């Protein structure tokens, strides 16, 4: 097979995703500007020939590219090279033509799943314009944008490491391997020159800035002073109030005559039960409770001895309005009163321990609409944020160690799919199952839930939904899976 037939044969067997991977791996040889007109593999091969990277008597760079994108079939069948030969060749100092840095980034993109990618994009919102972080943007696209803005480079992995630390800590292993091998290569070529100061301290500080309040300049180690203990088994009680049948409310209260049953709520109960059981909580479920029954149950758990437990969780799935949830009888139960049963004075055995409430209920009748997000933060946005945060001051006690996860902001509706469950609870459970094993804290997880739910649209009225976490936690809260 002649040279051009060989290239044509390879190009015919490579898809669009593989073309994107090849272009990324070639960035050190073909700059981004010159790559803009490359829309198929044959054009890429032409550019490589122009740059002297691809010649009839020298196919080493092409072999290396196919090796890195795991097209071993083309490597062996068309180019007559085995993966073992490539491994041996690339171990020879100076033989590799694709930088270890770029290979590391490419492999990182292969390691990251869709949920990781979604979180990665969210954490870059302040660094990269939202138009560059659309759903169809791949991680390779984002790496290119990060490089353009000088927040990612061969000698600058601080932002990358800090985000990977939050999204999925297992990703750090590949970066650490790259840094270690890079150091070894540098020492071997520079005769043992003294190593530069590690960037680890800078990474730690950056991660701390992302987690804590502005102005803190020193990282903290994770210990009992800044992390809630979560070792007991069971961790604590997880109460689930699942209200579905509102026929009594329709009969007894005229203004609620149009209140519907909550079809699909059982999917939420199942998801919550499964999720928190996996996280070692003792699940106790209650179906179709009146307002007084909800109060009675919480009073009974207020009086229980929680000394051997590290946490308390209460989930309420019901209809609601501003500051209240409805019992199935249509009577109102104040969210503030429900959470206040577990203050330190009323429930001493839970003092200093996290008390968590997840409320899936509307908080009004307004529909949230999509609005453009400006690239720059302004005074108006700060004002809105201030109002949003202050409007919830009476939902939880003025006391430490409470977390309230609301499905929606004040005055607005939340959405439930009769065949799948609610947007909020389903996203919450999926995020907890995926991210707790990675060592993420609850506030990071809830931030991801906000991002996920806020990107959904109600097809009937294009309504949006924005969950609202409210908390007085003093420490980081993790739910270890073991």
From Swiss-Prot:
Species for this entry: Rattus norvegicus (Rat)
Ranges of residues in domain DED: 2-80, 100-177
Protein name: Caspase-8
Gene: Casp8
Entry annotation: catalytic residues: 319, 362
Modification type Phosphoserine: residues: 188, 213, 390
Top enzyme category: hydrolase
Site feature Cleavage, where: 218-219, 376-377, 388-389
Family: Belongs to the peptidase C14A family.
Modification sites for Phosphotyrosine: 336
């Amino acid at each position: 097979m002649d040279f051009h037939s060989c290239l044509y044969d390879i190009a015919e067997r490579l898809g669009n995703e593989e073309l994107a991977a090849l272009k990324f791996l070639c960035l050190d040889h073909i700059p981004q500007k010159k790559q803009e007109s490359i829309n198929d593999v044959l054009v890429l091969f032409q550019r490589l020939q122009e740059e002297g990277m691809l010649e009839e008597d020298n196919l080493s760079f092409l072999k290396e590219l196919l090796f890195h994108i795991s097209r071993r079939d083309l490597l062996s069948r068309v180019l007559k090279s085995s993966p073992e030969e490539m491994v041996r060749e690339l171990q020879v100092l100076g033989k590799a033509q694709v930088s270890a840095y770029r290979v590391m980034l490419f492999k990182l993109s292969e390691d990251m799943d869709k949920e990781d990618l979604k979180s990665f994009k969210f954490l870059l919102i302040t660094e990269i314009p939202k138009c560059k972080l659309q759903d169809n943007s791949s991680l390779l696209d984002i790496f290119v944008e990060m490089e353009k803005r000088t927040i990612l480079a061969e000698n600058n992995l601080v932002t990358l490491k800090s985000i990977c630390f939050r999204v999925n800590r297992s990703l750090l292993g590949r970066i650490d391997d790259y840094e270690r091998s890079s150091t070894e290569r540098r020492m071997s070529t520079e005769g043992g020159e003294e190593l530069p100061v590690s960037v680890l301290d800078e990474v730690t500080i950056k991660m701390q800035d992302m987690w804590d309040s502005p102005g803190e300049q020193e990282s903290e180690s994770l210990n009992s002073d800044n992390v809630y203990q979560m070792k007991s088994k069971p961790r604590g009680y997880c109460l689930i109030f699942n209200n579905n049948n509102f026929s009594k409310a329709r009969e007894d209260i005229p203004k609620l005559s149009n209140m519907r049953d909550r079809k699909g709520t059982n999917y939420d109960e199942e998801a919550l039960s499964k999720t928190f059981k996996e996280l070692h909580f003792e699940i106790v479920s209650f179906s179709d409770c009146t307002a007084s029954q909800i109060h009675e149950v919480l009073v009974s758990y207020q009086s229980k001895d929680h000394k051997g437990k590290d946490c308390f969780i209460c989930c309420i799935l019901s209809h609601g309005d501003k500051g209240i949830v409805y019992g199935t009888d249509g009577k109102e139960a104040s969210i503030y009163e429900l959470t206040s049963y577990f203050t330190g004075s009323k429930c001493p055995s839970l003092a200093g321990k996290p008390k968590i409430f997840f409320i899936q209920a509307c908080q009004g009748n307004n529909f949230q609409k999509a609005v453009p997000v400006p690239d720059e933060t302004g005074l108006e946005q700060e004002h809105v944020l201030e109002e949003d945060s202050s409007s919830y001051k009476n939902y939880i006690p003025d006391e430490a160690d409470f977390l309230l996860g609301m499905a929606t902001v004040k005055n607005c509706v939340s959405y439930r799919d009769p065949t799948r469950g609610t947007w909020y609870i389903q996203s919450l459970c999926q995020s907890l199952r995926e991210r707790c094993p990675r060592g993420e804290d609850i506030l990071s997880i809830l931030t991801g839930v906000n991002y996920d739910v806020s990107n959904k649209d109600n097809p009937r009225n294009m309504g949006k939904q924005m969950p609202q976490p409210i908390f007085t936690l003093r420490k980081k809260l993790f739910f270890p899976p073991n």
